[in-house]
Amino acid sequence: MISPPWLAILWLGATGATPAWAAENATEPPSKNVSGAFILECETSQVCDSVAKAVEERGGTLRHRFKSDVFTGISVQLPKLTTEEDRRSLVSQFKGIKESWPVQQVIHVPESTADDRSEDKQDGTNEKEEELGKKPVAPPKTGMRHSRLGRRARNDDIESPWNHLMTHVDKLHEEGYTGSGIKIAVVDTGVDYKHPALGGCFGPGCKVITGENFSDEGDKSDPIDCHGHGTIVSGILAGYDEAKGFVGAAPDATIMAYRVLNCQARGTEDDMIAGWLKAKQDGAQIIISSTGLQGENWAQRPLAMVAARIVASGVPCVVGLGNEQHEGLFYAMNPSTGHGVTAVNSFGRAYAALEHRGEYSIGNTTEPVDFIFEPARGLDKWDRELRPVHDVDADFGDGPDDDLTAAKEVPISIDWSTRIEENCKLSPGNSSTGFAQDLVGHIALIRQTPETRDCHFYDRVQNAIARGAEHILAWQNDPVYVEIRRKDAMGRPVKAVGITGADVGRAMARALASGQPVKARRIGRVRIETGHIAGMSAYGPTWELDIKPTIGAPGHSVPVTYKGGGYGSDSGTSFAGPLVAGVFALMSQVRATFDPALLNSLIMSTAEPQISDDRLITVAQQGGGLLRAWEAAHATTLVEPGALTFNDTNNRPGSIGLRITNTAKTEVTYQLSNLAATTLYTFESGSIRPGVGEAVDATADINLSQTSITIGAGQSTTVDVSAIDPKGLDPERLPLWSGWVSIQGSDGGNLTVPYLGLGGSLRSAAVLDPASELSSLSSSEFILRDPPEGQKPGPSKAIEDSPAAIRSRAISTSFDLVLGSPLVRVDIVPLDMCSTSAPVNTTSVGTRGLAGLARGANVTELDLSRACVPDSIVTEFAGVRSIGQLPGYPKNYVKRGKVNLEWTGAFAPEHYAPPGRYQIVARALSIMGDASNEAHWQTVKSPVFSILYEHNVNVPEADQQPSEENSWKPWQTKEEEAAFWANYLAQHPELFQPKAGAEDTDAAENSLEK
């Protein structure tokens, strides 16, 4: 066993007050237990009824009753129960309780400050584009179909946002698939159903058709969103506002709103379970939730189990992976960790210099020519109206092929008003009566660099504006962002500015120079096919090495709806998940199925693995890769399973069968190969804590039983896949390797099946930090407050006060779980035990006091109820003798990180440890460990310390501490503080008598310092 010292045992002052600096800098954990609250799963509802009745008879309350075909249980609030044993004691009284868990508080971790928040601005929400030079060929449609959005798109009334273009959602919209008739539940902070993009009403016939409020605020029948998170999710999922050009992934789907968090985005695990189960009960066909318990990373927590069971019942469930990328590997959010749950990580787009598409025509008969450009200002002004192009440079005598590289540069400091009058006085359109308005309704084409002669680029822009132009299209050899003043020298606004490449500008100018008219317009946004992992994201896999995330989708700076009717853009995995849920709705229309396993397999196998720094990004960050909605909806080759998990070295399967099915009408030949992703060390060099992963070049050896197969129409073949750990890596650092089995079909299909494995042994890895430094202790002797009720252990006023003893509300300590643990115990271990048959000496200790007790005084000289613990209350587990565990322990499936503990002396309901010497011993079961095997436990111990209670100590009356009722509390006002000090000075005037030769104030300060 590992038995290093613990971190510091710290004194909690008698008031329990938090220093101001600590309060200002403290960050509340995203999840913690709700005191005395538990979730119980019952074999039958009758068992739950009996337990609920017993709880209420004891003065407890029923929090929730869960009656579902996937989960039968209750959550209860138990009064006056201080330990996990109390809950277990209650549970043991009833047969038919399958499992129980403490309720955790949920504190939603915000994604980001809004990238852009506006009533009107649509940051890229008004775009539709086909990939340049390519048109999707739609196979025969099956299942449901709705064509309203398809008609709208073809009539150019609304365009698709960039996240739809990247994932090919727009192609499904073009085919008329919009989620019509599909019910999608949003389990979140509620929905602002008054938002114009979300229907403006609540109830039958509305976009938001039903819902319920499970939070601790508001009307239980009204799921209105007072926080805003759920409204963003709902807009990405199914919003539609033609006037603002906003469209969600499944704009004709209906929403079911289940509010489980309050206005501060806080809630509890049982509230969330209630929302999930109600969504299923109400007939949701897809469930999306973008909130949960950060970093839990276990599939066995109750919320993850409920989500997994809903999936197993046939309802796809989609959850964001989390936003704690800085925490490194193995930090997925519960319930995304549930088996079969679709876990989504967030991508951003790979930015390009020119992201918008236009077209121009020459003469009256030629086909339009596509070109790309970037609007630097006035995106909404670059509409689809076809406008004539005018070459302003030609007006100044510059031809499209002139060599202007030697042109004189104009100084940066320019008086724009004088340049118009002097340098460009003879410019076209300039006459004694002012500038002619010959460019009204035109696009002014102007070369930006190299500098043009006679009149600078910016002068020519102002010349064009003065002549009535509202659209400026600059061109140059290396087009970059062009900045133009918002107004010209005469105060006229510059409404729309864009820039394009020299090949485009020169072609237009040449045509105009030859006397042919040119017309141009913007027609949408360029489809950007590649992305990068967003900063607001997380790492998998789970502690069982289940592949999470399932998929990646755009979640960084995506168009969103805000509560109150606004629009803008925002970031986080919360905003990648609803896009995937909407895609599931579209896929269900195309394929006429909601089978979660099939939908997951399709999105994973058709996804596009992404690259960073010339390496494929680990599967632990991108799952199958970047979502491709159209390809997933129309794929004719199916794979099962959708992902291959090879576990760690000690638990490696010999091989995994990969079944490939050809559902096409003709036979297809497939070529199989390995695509290896970046291998990451779980631990940095010299560390035992998971990090963001040091990348190494070594990859696993993947063996395929067949590399070329031909499968007939409607037939299947199984290929065996085996894996060997990368060579030359340190197994103690747990190298996490991954990649994809590539399946290229002769029909043009290109599928990839993700795989993942771990070198080394998770079971053997350190769970507890064996090198925790012990901070200096303020004391090894503690005088605890008397128990509020029940027993008063030890004799009263039998021990004289010790100047070394610390008076404390509780003993506080902490330990560090560097990995998660399936089971953690925290035992109270007495160092002095005696037989219950031994004689009891009830005499006082006298001057010996607590110090003597701490040194292990002879038990014959001490009161046995104080000096030693009767062995009748001692139990043994895995070689450790204990009187019980700290409140809340043992705990199952604990997340990694710092674990804070407090002990007030209690070890059972209304039972407190006798005065004496103790250690607190924490033990954590290794991942994949056997609880019955002592070798699978790791241990840390506190230093030895001694405890007494206030009533044990004989304190002179003048020095007695105030009672609990009269003890000092933090001042609420300055007046209270002033009154306290006035009273204190009146009672202790001797402390402030000035010393000889010193000023009064100095003496008072010196006395206070002493």
Could you tell me what each predicted segment is?
Residues 22, 49-164, 169-175, 199-204, ...:
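Autoinhibitory propeptides
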Residues 612-613, 640-641, 664-722, 727, ...:
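Surface-exposed binding patches on compact interaction domains or structured appendages
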Residues 649-657, 784-857, 862, 894-904:
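Contiguous beta-strand segments within globular domains
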Residues 64-65, 161, 247, 288, ...:
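C-terminal subdomain of the subtilisin-like protease fold in secreted/lumenal serine endopeptidases
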Residues 203, 215, 220-221, 448-451, ...:
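Catalytic-core environment of secreted peptidases
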